[in-house]
Every structure is written in structure tokens, then in C-alpha cells.
Design a protein with these regions (language model features):
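N-terminal Rossmann-like NAD(P) cofactor-binding subdomain of oxidoreductases
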Residues: 1-84, 89, 110, 178-182, ...
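Conserved active-site and cofactor/substrate-binding residues in soluble primary-metabolism enzymes
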Residues: 12, 36-43, 91-99, 142, ...
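Short glycine- and Lys/Arg-enriched binding-loop motifs that mark or flank ligand-binding interfaces
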Residues: 12, 34, 61, 123, ...
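PAPS/PAP-binding and catalytic site of the sulfotransferase fold
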Residues: 31, 146, 203
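Short, well-ordered alpha-helices that flank and scaffold nucleotide-derived cofactor binding pockets
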Residues: 46, 50, 102, 205, ...
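C-terminal substrate-binding/catalytic lobe of Rossmann-fold NAD(P)-dependent oxidoreductases
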Residues: 57, 62, 66-190
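C-terminal helical cap and adjacent loop that interface with cofactors, partners, or active-site loops
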Residues: 167-226
Length: 226
């Protein structure tokens, strides 16, 4: 539910993205779990926001499995429609954009850029694979250093030099991030399992923080063998 993800001043829910609000979550009475798309997209760009580097439009394409639609049956989640098929939905107007903008602005007060987000329905059951690109003149080595530094004390987000694929995160609570520079464009590839890091795994992570448990309790998950 998106009901308590946006700070409106009339509730005490903390936005439950540990890589952004770990300390606040530890002291919270109520936590609002982020959206799955919002989680994957934000993890790809939070380090840039912290260093005030989001100064151009963000172009985001993210493809999600059929379980991203929830448990309620629909025409676009039915196997016979989803199999060997692909389509976009809610282009430029997805409901997760509000929480993404809220988080980025909390780190970079000057952030006013457009987020051009195209969500895509994929022909697989679980996982989110996101590509984000933006203008950035900073060199790749420095960008990698910024990302490694930001996620150094976080247990589930990893920077990889190898071009990753979705099966490396399915059935885990991990997020993998891969960075590339193409002239003055920075390409960010991020991926999660929408049912774990994008939903129940993140809820368990938040619960562990709220109850002062080791944050990886119950989340030592291994990917399936493919």
C-alpha cells in the first residue's frame, strides 16, 4: 500500500528503505514498506543524490515479473497472456514516482529533474531489472568509489564490475548494481527480486532493525540453481 509512504505530517510512519533511513527505522513505531519498483530504482541512484550529482533528467526503464501485479488475478497476469509477451503500462505516471522523488529530494534538496519512467511487464514470474541513465561528467572510477562507499555498511546491496543478470538475485534479498560510462552518459543497471528485496524480504529487514536484531536474521537466502 502507498498510504503511508509519503510524508504528509499526519502520521508517524517512517519510509522503510534501510539503505536510506536505517537509523530512523531502528527508532520507529511504524514503518511503511517501499514499493518494489521504487526500491530497485532508488538503490540505483541514492549515492548520486547524496553527492548532489542528480542534475539532469533520469531515464528509467524497468521490467518486472508477473508477480509484481499482486495476487489478484487479472488479464495481464494470466499465464496464457503473459507467456512470450511484453508490454508497457503507466508510462511516465507510475504511482511509485512520488516516493522516489521524496527520497531523492531528502538527500539532494536541489533535485528538480524529471524522472522519465517506463514500466514494462515481462514474461517471467519474479524479479525487476532496471536500467537508468543520466548526464554525468564524473569519471567511472570515482563513481564506483562513491557507490562502494555509500553501500559499504549495508548488507544486501552490492556493486559488481561484471554485467549481471536477473537470475543472480531471484530468491534472494540482494540488489546488484552495475555501472557504465558512455561518453557523458552514466548507465546504472540495478536488479532485485520483487517478492523479497522488493517486498517481504525488506519487511523482515525492517522488522529486524525495529526489534534490534541482527539485520540479516532470516534473510540468509541462496539463489536457486538454474
Amino acid at each position: 500500500s502507498t498510504d503511508y509512504r509519503i510524508e504528509t505530517g499526519d502520521h508517524d510512519f517512517v519510509y522503510g528503505l534501510p539503505e536510506l533511513n536505517r537509523r530512523k527505522i531502528c527508532a520507529a513505531n511504524h514503518v511503511a514498506n517501499p514499493g518494489c519498483f521504487a526500491t530497485c530504482i532508488q538503490l540505483g541512484v541514492l549515492p548520486l543524490a547524496k553527492h548532489l550529482m542528480l542534475n539532469s533528467e533520469l531515464h528509467v526503464n524497468a521490467i518486472t515479473g508477473s508477480t509484481g501485479a499482486g495476487v489478484k488475478p487479472s488479464g495481464t497476469s494470466h499465464f496464457s497472456w503473459r507467456n512470450d509477451n511484453i508490454s508497457i503500462y503507466k508510462p511516465f505516471g507510475h504511482q511509485h514516482l512520488a516516493e522516489i522523488k521524496q527520497s531523492l529530494t531528502s538527500l539532494q534538496n536541489s533535485f528538480r529533474s524529471e524522472i522519465n519512467f517506463i514500466p514494462v511487464r515481462g514474461n517471467f514470474s519474479r524479479g525487476i531489472f532496471t536500467t537508468t541513465y543520466l548526464d554525468c561528467k564524473v569519471g567511472l572510477d570515482e563513481i564506483k568509489r562513491i557507490y562502494e562507499e555509500y553501500y559499504a555498511d549495508h548488507s544486501f546491496t552490492f556493486i559488481t564490475d561484471k554485467n549481471p543478470d536477473l537470475k543472480q538475485v531471484v530468491n534472494t534479498n540482494k540488489c546488484l548494481i552495475h555501472l557504465e560510462k558512455h561518453n557523458d552518459k552514466l548507465l546504472i543497471i540495478s536488479m532485485i527480486d520483487n517478492l523479497l528485496k522488493g517486498a517481504s524480504g525488506q519487511a523482515v529487514h525492517n522488522m529486524n532493525l525495529m526489534f534490534n536484531l541482527e539485520e540479516k536474521v532470516g534473510l540468509h537466502l541462496k539463489p536457486s540453481a538454474f
